[in-house]
Regions:
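Membrane-interface alpha helices of multi-pass inner-membrane proteins
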Residues: 115-117, 161-179, 186-191, 211-217, ...
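Membrane-interface transmembrane helices that cradle and orient dolichyl/undecaprenyl
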Residues: 103-109, 145-164, 193-199, 425
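Short acidic/glycine- and proline-prone juxtamembrane loop motifs at membrane-interface regions
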Residues: 33-34, 127-138, 178-181, 406-407
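Transmembrane alpha-helix segments characteristic
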Residues: 15-18, 282-322, 364-399
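Membrane-proximal lumenal/periplasmic loop motifs of glycosylation machinery
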Residues: 24-34, 48-88
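Transmembrane-helix motifs of polytopic, lipid-linked glycan transferases
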Residues: 85-106, 121, 144-148
Length: 454
């Protein structure tokens, strides 16, 4: 069996595994999940009238997701379950795409399967996969753009490079209508890729031409959305009159919680760094213990819930939190259980941070001064995903300043973290992921299925 066929088989198996986990959770309930009742209503109205009918709740355009859901409603009749079931092909395509991306960036076959399942079976992705929320379709559009941009990087000629970039621009400009944040693919990832490939003839000019066309299409789509009855555009900048000190402190907690939440979702990979704790000297171990203990005491005293953020994770794992209909949801984990997992996340993150400081940081400084070149996958990651990630977090800041950064907002960043951690593990520790990581993944998968079911 040749390599492409082998990778295709593994990607399909990952997609089927996530679909099987979703079916095992039996996500059947004729009621809303977070905001998807509003989106389902819009799909139902489109199936009945052929028009987009908003209801004053959604800040997302919804785009092709409404058409896709309406198709299933037309074919099988309306129900919450049927409309949510329409997302299953999108869920499986997202998982397949992620596996393909990991392989293209140089992740080994075994680790690519592990990384894909870490995302697909996570307590954040699986409940959203069983809903009609726009988060998973948004991630699909972003991953599709990343895949096409990576194909452009790997292309052998300037003509094929431009063709791949054209597909990336077209798919993102159209697909991003489901969730506006996905348009960062065409607005940021595309020109970043063009700049990386600027030495190829005509690529830089073509990429910025495609960027202009995409920006114009996005502007016209937003104009159309703003004129729809009961649409709900969300301003980027926070309103005047807010207490800057109070809200800045609030923002700091929100961003810190978001980072911890991302680390929690990649914990099956992150836990592999525990195998390196024996290489730490006594001074490093003392600092590690002090920081971890300080974090634990602070979180216990203040009842800070990070990394168990609102919406999905808090509903799954906090026994003191009620569902939006007032009924108790998944019994959750006791406080000591959540605290223990949080402390383990902090410990492994600190070990990783120490390794990044000692090994990666000198390489980045040498590259910045022009002394050395970054290895191929890291140069591609830097240009394709670096500006995208920065812009993504910049757009989260106004939300965190005013309200909260929900765990669902972090879904597109988790595949990036998975990719980077797997490559770092392969380079610095060992090629295969250790057995302890598989054990943690199995526990996470069981919790995800149970939480999604309830």
């Amino acid at each position: 069996m040749n390599k492409p066929t082998h990778d295709t088989r593994n990607g399909l198996l990952c997609a089927l595994a996530v679909a099987a986990a979703l079916w095992a959770s039996y996500p059947v309930a004729e009621m809303g999940f977070i905001d998807d009742w509003s989106y389902i209503k819009t799909a139902q109205m489109f199936a009945q009238t052929g028009h987009f009918v908003y209801n004053g709740w959604a800040v997302e355009i919804l785009g092709w997701q409404v058409l896709w859901g309406a198709l299933f409603i037309k074919l099988f009749g309306f129900s919450f379950t049927i409309t949510r079931l329409s997302m299953l092909p999108v869920v499986m395509a997202t998982i397949f795409l992620l596996h393909s991306i990991l392989r293209r960036f140089g992740v080994t076959p075994r680790n690519a399967i592990f990384g894909t399942l870490t995302f697909g079976l996570s307590p954040l992705f699986l409940p959203l996969a069983g809903s009609f929320m726009t988060d998973v379709p948004g991630v699909f559009v972003i991953l599709l753009c990343l895949y096409l941009c990576k194909r452009a990087v790997d292309a052998g000629t300037a003509r094929s490079t431009i063709a791949w970039l054209t597909l990336a621009a077209a798919s993102n400009a159209l697909g991003g209508s489901v969730r506006q944040i996905a348009w960062l693919g065409a607005l940021v990832m595309l020109p970043s890729t063009g700049w990386l490939l600027r030495k190829r003839r005509g690529v830089l000019l073509a990429s910025f031409f495609l960027w202009g066309i995409s920006a114009a299409a996005i502007f016209l789509t937003m104009q159309w959305f703003s004129h729809q009855p009961y649409s709900l555009p969300e301003p980027i900048l926070p309103p005047a009159g807010l207490n800057p000190i109070k809200h800045s402190i609030h923002l700091l907690f929100q961003l810190s919680g978001a980072l911890l939440c991302i680390l929690l979702m990649v914990f099956p990979i992150l836990v592999a760094w525990l195998t390196t704790v024996r290489s730490l000297n006594s001074a490093a171990l003392s600092k590690l213990a002090l920081i971890t203990a300080t974090f634990g005491v602070f979180e216990w005293i203040t009842s800070w819930t990070a990394p168990w953020l609102y919406h999905v994770l808090s509903a799954e794992f906090d026994p003191n939190r009620n569902g939006e209909n007032g009924a108790a949801m998944f019994p959750g984990l006791p406080k000591w259980g959540r605290e223990t997992i949080s402390l383990l996340v902090v410990v492994t993150a600190l070990i990783l941070l120490r390794q990044l400081r000692s090994k990666l940081w000198p390489q980045l400084k040498s590259w910045a001064k022009g002394r050395t070149a970054l290895p191929s996958p890291w140069q591609d990651i830097l240009w394709l995903l670096g500006p995208f990630t920065v812009c993504y977090f910049l757009l989260l800041i106004p939300r965190g300043y005013r309200f909260v950064i929900s765990d669902t907002y972090l879904l597109p960043i988790i595949p990036i973290a998975i990719l980077c951690l797997l490559l770092l593990h392969q380079r610095w520790i060992a090629k295969p992921i250790p057995r302890i990581s598989f054990a943690v993944l199995a526990i996470f998968a069981l919790l995800s299925v149970a939480g999604t079911h309830d």
